[in-house]
Regions:
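Solvent-exposed, non-transmembrane regions of membrane-associated and secreted proteins
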Residues: 1-77, 82-89, 97-148
Length: 148
């Protein structure tokens, strides 16, 4: 098993953040970081660098302003995502694209399911904000692959 990831850097959008471990909520949904300045990696799936999609989530904003993934929507194909692991290795991923999905129709298999190589998914909230529920209606998913 690969060492856990500890830090995320996305130079194109100015992200440099500590990574925390995320599990599942009692209802089965993936946890989100408790801190708006950190991102979290899903410990129930592959770790960055392992075969399959490693998933990292972060907040887009908070009541006080922008959060760690506020500018995630600005990423374009070819942008670089760097993940530092606990063993000192730095992994380089290249963005392949991004898509917004309704939370009600979230493509769990496409995001969390098997992949033919080491991949990375970055997830944050997007779309309209529902004031009644206190949540965004969509998720933005950035798809990236491990650079050779």
């Amino acid at each position: 098993m690969a060492p856990p990831p500890v830090r995320l850097e996305i130079p194109a959008i100015g992200v440099a953040a500590r990574l925390v471990r995320l599990g599942l909520e009692p209802g089965g949904a993936m946890q989100v970081p408790g801190d708006f300045t950190t991102a979290g990696w899903f410990a129930g799936g592959p770790r960055p660098g392992q075969l399959g999609p490693a998933v990292i989530a972060g907040h887009v904003d908070s009541r006080t302003g922008p959060a760690v993934f506020f500018r995630l929507r600005e990423l374009r194909s070819g942008d670089v995502v760097l993940v530092d692991r606990a063993d000192g290795a730095r992994l380089r991923f290249v963005v392949e694209g991004a898509r917004s999905f309704s939370k009600a129709g979230f493509p769990t298999a496409a995001v969390f399911g098997p992949a033919p190589s080491a991949a990375l998914r970055l997830i944050t909230c997007a779309g309209d904000f529902d004031r009644a529920s206190g949540h965004y209606l969509d998720n933005l998913v950035v798809f990236a692959r491990l650079a050779a």
